[in-house]
Amino acid sequence: MALPVTSDNFDEEVLQSEVPVLVDFWAEWCGPCKMIGPLVDAVASDTEGSAKVGKVDVDSQQERARTFNIQSLPTIAFFKGGEVVETMIGTMGVTVDVLKEKLAALA
């Protein structure tokens, strides 16, 4: 299951991570977010130890969403070395295999 990421743990879990990190920026009211949620959770289970997978609820973490200029949901951001290196916006092309491949390429 993906790790809930908040202002309290974002720096430690994402920015200071020694492994690549996938962060799913989502909201409870977002239908497409609910569609990809199970895919993100599957990636979290499949990549445990080699990567981190987190979820940021943009409604409760508005400042964090602003920091990364999140304007559309869902947005998946890939972090390496504390920097965003790639983003995927929407559901087009989001599969477990694609997400795992993108994380593996960052390892």
What are these regions (language model features)?
Residues 58-65:
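Structural microenvironment flanking redox-active thiols in thiol-disulfide oxidoreductases
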Residues 6, 26, 52-54:
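Conserved Rossmann-like nucleotide-binding pocket used by diverse enzymes
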Residues 77-107:
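Non-catalytic, surface beta->alpha helical segment in thiol-disulfide oxidoreductase systems
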Residues 22, 40, 64, 74-88:
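A short, hydrophobic beta-strand/beta-hairpin element that forms part of a small beta-sheet core
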Residues 18-20, 37-56:
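Conserved helix-turn-beta segment immediately C-terminal to the redox Cys motif
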Residues 25-39:
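Conserved redox-active cysteine motifs that mediate thiol-disulfide chemistry
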Residues 18-19, 25-29, 72:
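Short pre-active-site segment immediately N-terminal to redox-active cysteine/selenocysteine motifs
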Residues 3-21, 62:
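A short beta-strand-turn-helix
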